[in-house]
A protein has these predicted regions:
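C-terminal catalytic core of Y-nucleophile DNA break-rejoin enzymes
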Residues: 6-7, 72-131
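Short, basic (Lys/Arg/His-rich) helix/loop patches that form interaction surfaces
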Residues: 25-27, 109-168
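Basic, Lys/Arg- and aromatic-enriched nucleic-acid-binding interface segment
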Residues: 1-47
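Short amphipathic helical patch at the helix-1/turn junction of helix-turn-helix
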Residues: 40-42, 157-158, 182
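DNA/chromatin major-groove-contacting recognition/catalytic segments
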Residues: 8-11, 78-85, 168, 180-201
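Short, polar N-cap/turn motifs at the start of nucleic acid-interacting alpha helices
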Residues: 57-62, 159-181
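Alpha-helix N-cap/helix-start motif at helix boundaries, enriched for small hydrophobics
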Residues: 36, 48-53, 166
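Conserved tyrosine-mediated DNA breakage-rejoining catalytic core shared by Y-recombinases
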Residues: 16, 43, 52-89
Length: 201
């Protein structure tokens, strides 16, 4: 149960994402973190694949852009479409500077703090005295990490986009693993409900 809680607490809401989008007057470095952060929320990739994105992986689409990723963990190629005007504009000019995983994780928390994402939230933090993760109540921005981006992507699209399509993008091979990842349990009617939405006869 503790592991499931850890998954659930790190998600960002749509309202919180809009607050991040609306941030201004950030330093150049912090705004670069914000851009990578918002891109991660729109493409659902692991941080190692996200931060290795290069201009040659970007292609024009009829209604946005295609991003071609090679997922290192699964050894699979995947193309993700993006159409958010802000993200498309940044990608078209490739307004992203290289950044390390460690610096990115620190920057995410700072961006979230600037956006006022500070609701006291149950989660895990490293206790420096014991060197173990400790469950407690913390301002939500302290709990945001690069893992939060992919999980938020999956959670916000779940129930709106067919689950196999989300799994293809995030790189999950088993539905049970995917559902655990976003803190859901398998609903025996989910497949039937999804099918009914697509029926046209």
């Amino acid at each position: 149960m503790g592991k499931l809680k850890e998954y659930l607490i790190n998600n960002l809401t749509e309202e919180e994402i809009k607050r991040i989008e609306g941030l201004s007057n950030l330093s150049t470095t912090l705004d670069n973190h914000r851009r990578w952060m918002l891109l991660g929320l729109h493409v659902g990739q692991r941080v190692s694949d996200l931060l290795s994105l290069k201009p040659h992986q970007i292609r024009e689409a009829d209604d946005g852009l295609y991003l071609d990723f090679f997922q290192k963990k699964t050894r699979k190629a995947i193309t993700v479409g993006v159409k958010n005007p802000l993200i498309v504009d940044w990608l078209s000019n490739f307004d992203f500077k290289p950044i390390s995983d460690q610096a990115f994780n620190r920057g995410l928390k700072m961006v979230a703090q600037k956006a006022g994402i500070d609701t006291m939230t149950e989660g895990y933090q490293m206790d420096r005295s014991t060197r173990r993760r400790s469950l407690g109540l913390y301002p939500k921005y302290q709990l945001i990490s690069s893992h939060s981006l992919r999980r938020t992507f999956a959670t916000l699209h779940y129930g709106k986009v067919p689950t196999p399509l989300i799994m293809e993008i995030t790189g999950h091979s088993k539905e049970t693993t995917f559902l655990s990842y976003i803190g859901k349990t398998r609903n025996k009617d989910h497949i039937a409900d999804t099918f009914l939405r697509y029926l046209n006869f």
